[in-house]
Amino acid sequence: MTKFIFVTGGVVSGLGKGITSASIGMLFKARGFRTTNIKIDPYLNYDAGTMNPYQHGEVFVLDDGGEVDLDLGNYERFLDTSLSFDHNITTGKVYSAVIEKERKGEYLGATVQVIPHITNEIKERIRRIARDYDVVVVEIGGTVGDIESMPFLEAARQMQIEEGRENVAFVHVTYVPRLRVVGEQKTKPTQHSVKELRSLGIQPDAIVARSEDPLEDSARRKISLFTNVPEEAVISAYDVEDTYEVPLMLEKEGLPAYLARRLGLPEREPDLEAWREMVEKYKSLTDTVEIAIVGKYVKLADSYLSIKEALKHSSVANDVKVKIRWIEAEDVERQGVKLLEGVDGIIVPGGFGARGTEGKMMAIRYARENNIPFLGICFGFQLTVVEFARNVLGLEGAHSTEIDPQTPYPVVDLMPEQRDLDRLGGTMRLGAYPVHIKPNTLARRLYGREIVYERHRHRWEVNPDYVEKFEEAGLVFSGIAGDDERRMEILELPGHSYFIATQFHPEFKSRPMRPAPVFRGLVEAAKKKKYGS
């Protein structure tokens, strides 16, 4: 019988429900249970694909092409797994499905309502995923009390009745602030949040109390008393330097063991040795390198969350800690490349639109001409081609037709299959595609094999009409699409300390124990630049 753990949030948003959910899933998987995570997003968008990174953070892309919430990236990294588009349930998906069924007459003339039709659709989607697993962790986005999340909380309440209380548990993540004036942790916000949750028919089985420092015993006792939750199930989750410490914290606090007992699962010791070694190694690193990320969304670091994590994974692999220098591309346009002085490596990440493109190309040129390790991703790959066309081939005015439709040298152009589309959502070249890597290249050395599958999210590509000119000038296209040999996937510059760019997003498949090869190579080159071989 599948066991369900619903994770809800209270008091304020941004407490780390995603990391908590990922950690719970990882700890059950470490006990040998077949485990997966589901994220519920109460917004009306069908998916995350058209959402502004400043509002929602990065759009994470799955193997099957799903454009999803960044929390699914955390799930994949913590559980070392690959999820599907169905693992992200949104209000937009649910309502679209119900309306489509109503139009087809599947409800036999019934009045279609939130209860039971919307809640039934939610439950069916959760159960569809759950069939192949022992434990399913379901994170319900938003904060208890939000109108948007009401149908999902109601569906979760119903599932506890239908599946049996012994098969469904609730974990509520709350905030316990410390008021400087009185110097004590305040539990009243948690009490009121649980009161709100109980008014919806849900009694939490465990409370994860987020705080700046460890939860005091007096606060733990008070939370237990006023929320009807055992003291052992009031979990202290205080701020830590590295999110990968959270599973170890929750394990020490006894949360997974308590939930296993609550759900009638057999007691098992978790295999956390490799994870613990990874965390301890990262904390012990003393040597550092500084890598600049030159982008258009750097004011919100979550816009590039998977890149941050890939650099962290590569830190452990290379025995050196990466310090990130966040640089707004438009600031490079205004202040020049002096903003890049002293860095050991440069990344130009993906993005859309004209803002900051010249600044990004200034950063690319600076890396190319000064032998600074460089990695370009997606739009960064395309702008690397544009920069090379302008400053090496001498093609004045060369550009991508995305930015300049009238450019005399369209070295980056819209893919043919994209030209007649009339909608934005879900229509890009999305998901995992095969990439064929040429022998005797940097890319082949990094990946160690001929064919790799990497995740994509783009509409534009290198114009194949210009490939020969680039290669004659010394640029090497070392990776080619497996589904179209005219589509360039990886470029590199021989003789440079490290200069590589990819049309795909390597960060989406990076894992704590298995860093993405191009990130690992970048950090290795940055370390060599700073400290020598």
Swiss-Prot record:
Mg(2+) binds at D71, E139. CTP binds at S13, D146, I147, E148, K186, T187, K188, P189, T190, Q191, K222. It comes from the Archaea. It is an enzyme of class 6 (ligase). Residues 290-532 form the Glutamine amidotransferase type-1 domain. L-glutamine binds at Y54, G351, F379, G380, F381, Q382, E402, R459. ATP binds at G14, L15, G16, K17, G18, I19, D71. Disulfide bonds: none annotated. UTP binds at S13, K186, T187, K188, P189, T190, Q191, K222. Keywords: ATP-binding, Glutamine amidotransferase, Ligase, Magnesium, Metal-binding, Nucleotide-binding, Pyrimidine biosynthesis. InterPro entries: Class_I_gatase-like, CTP_synthase, CTP_synthase_N, GATASE, GATase1_CTP_Synthase, P-loop_NTPase. One of its GO terms (biological process) is 'de novo' CTP biosynthetic process. Allosterically activated by GTP, when glutamine is the substrate; GTP has no effect on the reaction when ammonia is the substrate. The allosteric effector GTP functions by stabilizing the protein conformation that binds the tetrahedral intermediate(s) formed during glutamine hydrolysis. Inhibited by the product CTP, via allosteric rather than competitive inhibition. Its EC number is 6.3.4.2. Pathway: Pyrimidine metabolism; CTP biosynthesis via de novo pathway; CTP from UDP: step 2/2. It catalyses: UTP + L-glutamine + ATP + H2O = CTP + L-glutamate + ADP + phosphate + 2 H(+); L-glutamine + H2O = L-glutamate + NH4(+); UTP + NH4(+) + ATP = CTP + ADP + phosphate + 2 H(+). Belongs to the CTP synthase family. Homotetramer. Catalyzes the ATP-dependent amination of UTP to CTP with either L-glutamine or ammonia as the source of nitrogen. Regulates intracellular CTP levels through interactions with the four ribonucleotide triphosphates. This is CTP synthase. The gene is pyrG.
